[in-house]
Amino acid sequence: MNRLTGKYTLITGGSSGIGLATAREFIAEGATVAITGRNKDRLLAAKQELGADVLILQSDTSDVEEQKLLAAQLTKMWPRLDAVYINAADVTHLPVTDWNENTFDRVMNTNFKGPFFLIQALLPLLADPCSVILCGTVSTKIGLPQSSIYASSKAALCSLAKTLSGELLSRNIRFNCLVPGPTDTPAHMNLNTTDPDAVKHLQQEIKALVPLGRLGKPIELAKAAVFLASDESSFMLGTEILVDGGVGNI
């Protein structure tokens, strides 16, 4: 199918996991794709897999100045952006007693502050119409231990689906939140926790929460992202789509 033919699309955090799977699907649907990531080697590996036409841009989502530079680079190279997927994230999970200010700021800067200022910087490039997809987390729906700051940062991000949809209604820019449940990705495998036993225990605890009894697959999120990026979702804004195995509702 060619549901994204002619569309210029940006995926942050596109070198692995859900972002990479989404880039594959966007390309298969005819989109022109740019991906970002912090790690140059991973970006180059992703480009080798995705093809020479994919634009790779090294960028640290937590750095506001780098987000402004990213927007400036895209503005020079592309005529517009038809869809943006804010996917890059810091998934650090820690007990409430173990958080310090530096780790708190890193998670908030990556998951909320950086994305907000990227959106701001991209506004002149966003097409009419445009779809902006914000990657949330089902942890905002439940009381998952150790997810306090991660879930809070994602709740802040997804609140933009409503506030910015309302504010930018005249521009025909639609913001929606795509909410993954526990998904089999590299991020899920480490959770930015250094204690291997703690990681294993937390992974088991998370998997046990899923009514369907398994982790999600990145392609399952990617298919939902294609829908939100396409004209098929043109009557949707300010809302959430949960692809979570039932965690948030059952």
What positions do the PLM features span?
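Active-site loop immediately N-terminal to the catalytic Tyr-X3-Lys motif
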Residues: 97, 129, 142-148, 170, ...
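Active-site helix of classical SDR
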Residues: 119, 153, 161
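Conserved glycine-rich cofactor-binding loop
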Residues: 8, 15-17
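Substrate-binding pocket helix/loop in short-chain dehydrogenase/reductase
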Residues: 95-96, 100-108, 206
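Alpha-helical segment proximal to the catalytic Tyr-Lys
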Residues: 124, 166-170, 234
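Short C-terminal tail/terminal secondary-structure segment
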Residues: 226, 237-250
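Residue(s) in the substrate-gating loop at a strand-loop-helix junction
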Residues: 137
